[in-house]
Each structure stands twice: as structure tokens, then as C-alpha cells.
Amino acid sequence: MAVFNSFTFDGINSLDSGVYITGQAVFNAPERVVEMVTVPGRNGAIAIDQGRFENIEVTYPAGCFADNQQDFAEKIATLRNELASRYTYKRLTDTYNPDEFRLGLYRSGLEASAVRYNTAGEFDIVFDCKPQRWLVSGETAQTFTRSGSITNPTLFDAKPLLAVTGSGILTLGTQTMTIIARASSSSVLYIDCESQEAWEVVGAGKVSRNDYIQNAGEEFSVLSAGANTVALGSGITRVVITPRWWRI
């Protein structure tokens, strides 16, 4: 029995519409943003790294097969509409890279060149994706009830999601933050080091708590390549770290 490769976008698997992918051109890398500055009287240019990468266009060469012409047209139309109805970045995975995922937007494609009595065709499906290849392993939370360390297996700084119980000084990597005491010592303060937001869950909603943290140097924690210290100061009883490892 033939095994076909596929992609899944926001829970929609391409094989549900009879669409398979070949995988070519799925492995491209994003462009690093670098400003080149020339100085009068100086040979060459100075490269100033902007600390970020551009979005990347991910193209899946794909094909579809059906029992008849009407079925073929319906499958293509169904998948196109399902993909196009997502207006924000959604999770994108494929069977070529099962340990990774991207965040992307459907951009174009699914214009099939039909063959075999209009019951099969080939086409490209194009997504505009954020530059990171997120590792599935980076979604696994690690819990600390005492000081320890966490190891970043990649070469890129990760910006974790923290869930902190207690108050006091917390050191993660080279950054130190002070968690201000709250009414309940058992309440959990969530800190997103990517969006630089802090909040508590109250009832069914989130309440902003950015004023509950003080960052030394105004920097939020990052997990650098290799081992990173996790130091729980007096009063911090538990820290749960979702590391969000990524590569390009």
C-alpha cells in the first residue's frame, strides 16, 4: 500500500482532501536581516546584525487524485477554502519533519493543472511562515522546585514561557527578575518572555500582571545555547519552564 506524505495546517490534514506532497523545496532557510554600512575612506562595509530573520515562503509541491472530475474539483475547492479561512498564523507541520513545526499563513496555490480525464493534478501550495522551525521537544514543560539547570540543544536563544509560584528573586540563564509578593502565595504568575507579558488566570480570563515583575536591566529571560542556570531564590517554590526551542 502506497504511503503519501502530507502537511497539517491548524488541524487540517491535506490527505483528508486527497492532497499529498512531494517535499521538495520544504527545507529552505530564512534570510538574516543585516544592515551593511559603508564608511568613507574605509574598504568594504560594516555588517550590523539586526538580531532577527525575515519570514520565509514555504512551498509544497503537491498533487491530488479523485474518482471523477466532480470529486477532484470538490476536493481542491474544499482544501483551498479551509486553508484560506485562517486569517492568523497557525501551526503548520508535515510528515517530512515530524519533530518540528512552523507558524504560517496560507498564501496561494491550489490551482491544479488537471490530467487523466480531469481526475488528478499537480500544483504548489504556498505558505508565508515565521522564520523559526519550532522543535516539538520545546513544548515539553520542565518543572523546578529547587535550583538546577536547563540545556538548550540549539544554537539560538529561546524565549520561554514561565509559570512561577511564590515571590522573590528568580535567575534564569544570565537574567535575574524579582517576583513581587501577591495576595496568595500559591497563585501562579505566567511570564511570556517572547511577548514580554505577565499575567494571572482569574476565573475564565487573564489579568495583566506586568507590574508584578522587576527585570534587572529591563531584559526578559532567554535560554542561550548550552546549559542555563535556574536559581530559585527564597520564596520561589516552583517554576515551570516551557522552553520553546527553535532553529532555522
Feature locations, PLM:
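Polar/acidic, low-complexity leader/linker segments enriched in S/T/G and N/D
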Residues: 1-40
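Short, solvent-exposed beta-alpha or beta-beta edge segments that form flexible loop/patches at the rim
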Residues: 24-61, 110
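Short, acidic/charged, Gly/Pro-enriched secondary-structure junctions
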Residues: 8, 12-13, 63-108
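Intrinsically disordered, low-complexity segments enriched in serine, threonine, and glycine
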Residues: 135-248
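Solvent-exposed loop and beta-edge segments used for protein-protein assembly and interaction
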Residues: 52-56, 84-86, 117-121, 154-156, ...
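Short beta-strand and beta-hairpin "edge-sheet" elements
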Residues: 89-133, 139
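A structural signal for short, hydrophobic beta-strand segments that form beta-sheets
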Residues: 16-26, 106-112, 241
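Oligomerization/assembly interface segments of phage tail-like spikes and tubes
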Residues: 45-70, 119-133, 228
